[in-house]
Amino acid sequence: MAYPFQLGLQDATSPIMEELTNFHDHTLMIVFLISTLVLYIISLMLTTKLTHTSTMDAQEVETIWTILPAVILILIALPSLRILYMMDEINNPALTVKTMGHQWYWSYEYTDYEDLCFDSYMIPTNDLKPGELRLLEVDNRVVLPMELPIRMLISSEDVLHSWAVPSLGLKTDAIPGRLNQATVSSNRPGLFYGQCSEICGSNHSFMPIVLEMVPLKYFEDWSASMI
């Protein structure tokens, strides 16, 4: 969940988001060390009075500043490739949900169940109840079982959209005529909010996403009541 004036990432709720948070910290530390080194060298150049006007080349220095950046790039690329593989790979999903973007709402279809589908519209500000969040609440939440791998198939009926839930580490483009895939998995129950993250028209800001992650038994009871 996001908070006012928040500067950091949202709390990780899925294994993928935990990996992304660790990778963010790993990369940020490398960037911080490089920036510190560069600023230190610049300060030395501005303050020292010693110069080497006769130096034409420095083979050792050139070797270092060629090899060192290559090593740094490898240290960044290896964990990045691992996370990319984890985000794309899904074996034996417990559930498949088809998500379609529209101007300006989402529709969901539980493909493992017959006739379990619905549209999800934003609740207008005037209809909100005490404690509900402005521009983030919907009339029909996506109820999913926690601690199970779930495959989301994402596409669009009209223009480009993007289905994003930050606390789960999800952001997948919804493209007309193309079916994209994302993996949803939550470590704990709760409500997780997202929004369309691709400018899709005048009401782009009014396409919220609400995932309600519940234990498997509650999900089975809910799905039985919806059919």
Swiss-Prot record:
InterPro entries documented for this protein: CcO_II (IPR045187), CcO_II-like_C (IPR002429), CcO_II_C (IPR034210), Copper_CuA (IPR001505), Cupredoxin (IPR008972), Cyt_c_oxidase_su2 (IPR014222), Cyt_c_oxidase_su2_TM_dom (IPR011759), Cyt_c_oxidase_su2_TM_sf (IPR036257)
Mitochondrial matrix side: 46-59
Record's GO cellular component terms: mitochondrial inner membrane; respiratory chain complex IV
Single biological process term from Gene Ontology: ATP synthesis coupled electron transport
One matching Pfam family: COX2
Major localization class: mitochondrion
UniProt KW Membrane keyword: yes
Amino-acid positions noted as binding Cu cation A2 in the UniProt annotation, renumbered to this chain: 196, 198, 200, 204
Location relative to the cell: Mitochondrion inner membrane
Enzyme Commission designation: 7.1.1.9
Binding site for Cu cation A1: 161, 196, 200, 207
Binding-site residues for Mg(2+), renumbered to this chain: 198
Catalytic activity: 4 Fe(II)-[cytochrome c] + O2 + 8 H(+)(in) = 4 Fe(III)-[cytochrome c] + 2 H2O + 4 H(+)(out)
Membrane topology (UniProt): Multi-pass membrane protein
Record PROSITE patterns: COX2, COX2_CUA, COX2_TM
Entry-annotated residues carrying Phosphotyrosine: 218
Positions on the Mitochondrial intermembrane side per record topology: 1-14, 88-227
Family stated for the protein in its record: Belongs to the cytochrome c oxidase subunit 2 family.
Chain's role: Component of the cytochrome c oxidase, the last enzyme in the mitochondrial electron transport chain which drives oxidative phosphorylation. The respiratory chain contains 3 multisubunit complexes succinate dehydrogenase (complex II, CII), ubiquinol-cytochrome c oxidoreductase (cytochrome b-c1 complex, complex III, CIII) and cytochrome c oxidase (complex IV, CIV), that cooperate to transfer electrons derived from NADH and succinate to molecular oxygen, creating an electrochemical gradient over the inner membrane that drives transmembrane transport and the ATP synthase.
Subunit-level organization: Component of the cytochrome c oxidase (complex IV, CIV), a multisubunit enzyme composed of 14 subunits. The complex is composed of a catalytic core of 3 subunits MT-CO1, MT-CO2 and MT-CO3, encoded in the mitochondrial DNA, and 11 supernumerary subunits COX4I, COX5A, COX5B, COX6A, COX6B, COX6C, COX7A, COX7B, COX7C, COX8 and NDUFA4, which are encoded in the nuclear genome.
Protein name listed in UniProt: Cytochrome c oxidase subunit 2
Species assigned in the record: Hybomys univittatus (Peter's striped mouse)
Organismal lineage: Eukaryota, Metazoa, Chordata, Craniata, Vertebrata
Name of encoding gene: MT-CO2
